[in-house]
Design a protein with these regions (language model features):
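Class I S-adenosyl-L-methionine
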Residues: 1-7, 11-128
Length: 128
C-alpha cells in the first residue's frame, strides 16, 4: 500500500529506527523535522538537544502540497515525557491535507487523526 511513515528517533537510536523502518517495508526518504528541545543533555560525543523525525516511503507518493513552505527545523520546549510538539502534526497536515493519518503510541486524541496508544483514553489526574 502507498503510505508515508513519519518516525521519531534520537541520535543514539538512529540505526534501530532505520532498521524498524526497513522491517515495516518502508524505504528511507529523508529527515522531515529536527526538533530542538531547548534543553541540553549529556550526549555520547557532543551535548544532545535534538530529536529527528524521519520519513519512510512505501509505494509512489506524490510531492506534498506546500512542502516548499514547511520548514524542517523547529525549536520548542520539551513537554511531558515522550510527548512530541503539536506543531509537527500541523506541518504534516499542511503538507498532506487530504490523506488519512494515524498516530501510533499517541498520548491524546487529535481531530482528523486515528490515534492509537495507551494514553489516548486516560484522563490526567487533578492536582490539588
Amino acid at each position: 500500500q502507498q503510505s508515508l511513515l513519519f518516525m521519531w528517533t534520537s541520535n543514539p537510536h538512529l540505526p534501530e529506527a532505520l532498521g524498524l523502518m526497513k522491517a515495516w517495508d518502508f524505504k528511507w526518504a529523508t529527515v522531515a523535522f529536527v526538533w530542538d528541545k531547548q534543553r541540553v543533555n549529556p550526549g555520547y560525543y557532543t551535548m544532545s538537544q535534538i530529536e529527528l523525525c524521519l520519513v519512510g516511503k512505501r509505494g509512489r507518493i506524490p510531492q506534498p502540497r506546500g512542502a516548499r513552505n514547511v520548514r524542517q527545523f523547529l525549536s520548542s520546549p520539551r513537554g511531558i515525557h515522550s510527548a512530541k510538539p503539536e506543531e509537527v502534526r500541523w506541518r504534516i497536515e499542511q503538507m498532506f491535507p487530504t490523506q488519512k493519518k494515524i498516530e501510533l503510541f499517541a498520548r491524546e486524541k487529535v481531530p482528523g487523526w486515528d490515534c492509537w496508544g495507551n494514553g489516548v483514553n486516560k484522563v490526567a489526574p487533578l492536582v490539588a
